[in-house]
Amino acid sequence: MKVFALAPNENWICDRFCNEWNQFSNGEYTENIHEADIIWLLGAWAWRAVPLDYLSKKKVVATIHHITPSKFTKESLREFLSRDRYVDAYHVPCQQTSDFISKITNKDIYVIPFWVNQNIWAPTPEKDAAKNREKYNLPTEAFLVGSFQRDTEG
């Protein structure tokens, strides 16, 4: 079975997810949508880039990364429902997104966190951690968690 993962080509995390999927999926991917059994809308907002005849004839999985309920407008709902006609199942990374979209679709929803590419994300070596704590005046006993992202929410 071959999966075509749609990269939105925005130089963002979804493009990296597509590249990593293609690199590490053990040959279960195709970069040719004609050969695909499944179309994975990894950047679901870019779904209109796929010809409707492909969306109609193939299995379609859409990833919904997050929804901010206060920003989910009537137009957002119309767009969701337009895409929903072609989607067979949804992938979401968290329960909150599943809870939200379960109210507007009857399609299967799979809650699966994203993977971590250990080739680019790894623990900081102790000597570097100590230097950073000193440089940024962080307590040596504290457990620190960092988030590094380009955020669409500002």
Question: What are the functions of these language-model segments?
Answer:
Residues 1-49:
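N-terminal pre-catalytic "stem/leader" segment of glycosyltransferase-like enzymes
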Residues 26-28, 60, 77, 132, ...:
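Catalytic phosphate/metal-binding cores of nucleic-acid and nucleotide-processing enzymes, i.e., regions
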Residues 38-43, 53-71, 89-91:
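Active-site proximal beta-strand in glycosyltransferases
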Residues 71-90:
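Membrane-proximal helix-turn-helix segments that form the acceptor-binding/catalytic region
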Residues 88-102, 106-126:
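Donor nucleotide-sugar binding/catalytic pocket of nucleotide-sugar-dependent glycosyltransferases
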Residues 122-138:
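A short helix/loop element that forms part of the nucleotide-sugar donor recognition site in Leloir-type
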Residues 139-154:
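Conserved donor-binding/catalytic core segment of Leloir-type glycosyltransferases
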